[in-house]
């Protein structure tokens, strides 16, 4: 079993919840092609501005992959402006394992996460990625911090 951190926006998190599917752009084919049924995916929602407030990055749920990767170009996901008209066509069907009552504050965990080697420039470990594999101990740390 492999553990994944899937990086998305608040808008696309709502779609993941509704449709039980994860999708990435074509350029992330190498990462998603390694996802297998039974793998566990943590959904990480990026930081965003809400009015004058900043809502920090958070982990909101655990899902299990229940399909192989498949291609579907239907436009269910919202493409951020910087990505143009992206359809996120490479997809995996999901089964919810746990949707956290309260999202996990990702920044608080950075000092203890093994996959983040540079704690001061931690965003570099996520920037430009749709998903990344994480060690089991990081998966357990994140999920044990949830409610």
UniProtKB/Swiss-Prot annotation:
SUPFAM superfamilies: PUA domain-like. It holds the Pfam family EVE. Coiled coil: none annotated. It comes from the Archaea. Gene3D superfamilies: ph1033 like domains. PANTHER family: UPF0310 PROTEIN MJECL36. Belongs to the UPF0310 family. This is UPF0310 protein Kcr_0474. It comes from Korarchaeum cryptofilum (strain OPF8).
């Amino acid at each position: 079993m492999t553990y994944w951190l899937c990086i998305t926006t608040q808008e696309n998190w709502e779609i993941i919840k509704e449709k039980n599917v994860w999708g990435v752009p074509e350029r992330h084919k190498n990462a998603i092609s390694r996802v297998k049924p039974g793998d566990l995916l943590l959904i990480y929602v990026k930081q965003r501005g809400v009015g004058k407030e900043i809502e920090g990055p958070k982990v909101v749920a655990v899902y299990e992959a229940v399909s192989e990767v498949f291609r579907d170009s239907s436009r269910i996901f919202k493409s951020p402006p910087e990505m143009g008209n992206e359809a996120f066509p490479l997809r995996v069907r999901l089964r919810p394992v746990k949707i956290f009552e309260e999202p996990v504050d990702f920044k608080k965990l950075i000092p203890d996460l093994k996959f983040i080697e540079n704690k001061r420039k931690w965003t570099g470990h996520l920037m430009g990625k749709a998903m990344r594999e994480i060690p089991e101990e990081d998966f357990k740390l994140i999920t044990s911090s949830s409610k």
